[in-house]
């Protein structure tokens, strides 16, 4: 993981915080698989305090709840509770409590572009630099993502998918994060960080499909090179075709 180009460019070179929240999500996945849901949800809460994109993992928790019956719906309340606890230093120093609740809601309207150097579905169908497409597809992107995730929920229920199986669990987790990146609006190239790490973990633990994290990491590398160095070996649209095929 540490030698991945995604980690090197994102964390060491660009000094982004994606490694922090991703680390806690990986711990959450580990503890959930070990039937320690309280610890798992605590780690999700900590991750959420660092970055909003932790919500990409929430559907997996719902799938796990439906599939295994090993967690309670009450466990989900641990996430906001831990988030508030993590924000207590800011409150003690005088920041209004309402800011803790609204700060992420305000971020959802930041960066009014349908995609930002992210080779997802919208890079295939429109110009990401045209703000018109943001307003055209913003609401649609949310409904589309929910619909796709909802279809997976139906499949898990109908097929009785066993998420206690580690390989199935990791694949479902990767697919869920990939779905959010692929269909939500205003996705950055950096949002693929969590997906890359989960795929590397999957390849290392299961020792199958080693080419998948390699392709995903190379696609992320293309995004970092374009943003940081204005270097584009292949176009965003062609990269989006590869990314969609990988999905």
Where are these regions (language model features)?
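Short acidic/glycine- and proline-prone juxtamembrane loop motifs at membrane-interface regions
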Residues: 12-20, 188
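Aromatic-rich transmembrane-lumenal/periplasmic boundary elements in polytopic membrane proteins
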Residues: 75, 80-120, 124
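Specific aromatic-rich, kink-prone transmembrane helix
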Residues: 20-37, 198-199
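Perimembrane helix-loop-helix junctions
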Residues: 56-81, 92-93, 194
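Aromatic/glycine/proline-enriched transmembrane-helix motif characteristic
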Residues: 107-182
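Membrane-interface alpha helices of multi-pass inner-membrane proteins
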Residues: 8-9, 27-31, 38-63, 85, ...
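Transmembrane and membrane-interface helices of multi-pass
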Residues: 1-7
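Transmembrane helical bundles and short interhelical boundary loops of multi-pass, membrane-embedded
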Residues: 100-117, 173, 206-247
């Amino acid at each position: 993981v540490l030698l991945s180009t995604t980690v090197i460019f994102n964390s060491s070179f660009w000094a982004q915080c994606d490694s922090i929240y991703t680390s806690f999500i990986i711990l959450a996945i580990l503890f959930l698989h070990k039937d320690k849901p309280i610890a798992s949800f605590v780690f999700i809460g900590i991750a959420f305090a660092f970055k909003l994109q932790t919500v990409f993992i929430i559907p997996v928790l719902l799938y796990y709840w439906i599939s295994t019956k090993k967690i309670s719906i009450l466990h989900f309340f641990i996430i906001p509770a831990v988030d508030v606890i993590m924000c207590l230093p800011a409150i003690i120093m005088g920041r209004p409590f309402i800011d803790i609740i609204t700060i992420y809601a305000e971020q959802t309207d930041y960066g009014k572009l349908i995609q930002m150097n992210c080779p997802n579905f919208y890079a295939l169908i429109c110009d990401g630099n045209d703000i018109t497409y943001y307003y055209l597809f913003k609401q649609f992107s949310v409904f589309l993502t929910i619909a796709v995730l909802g279809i997976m929920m139906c499949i898990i229920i109908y097929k009785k998918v066993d998420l206690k199986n580690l390989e199935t669990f990791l694949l479902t987790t990767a697919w869920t994060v990939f779905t959010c990146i692929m269909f939500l609006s205003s996705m950055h190239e950096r949002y693929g960080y969590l997906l890359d790490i989960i795929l590397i973990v999957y390849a290392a633990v299961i020792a199958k499909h080693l080419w998948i994290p390699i392709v995903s990491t190379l696609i992320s590398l293309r995004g970092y090179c374009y943003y940081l160095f204005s270097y584009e070996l292949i176009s965003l649209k062609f990269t989006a075709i590869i990314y969609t095929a990988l999905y």
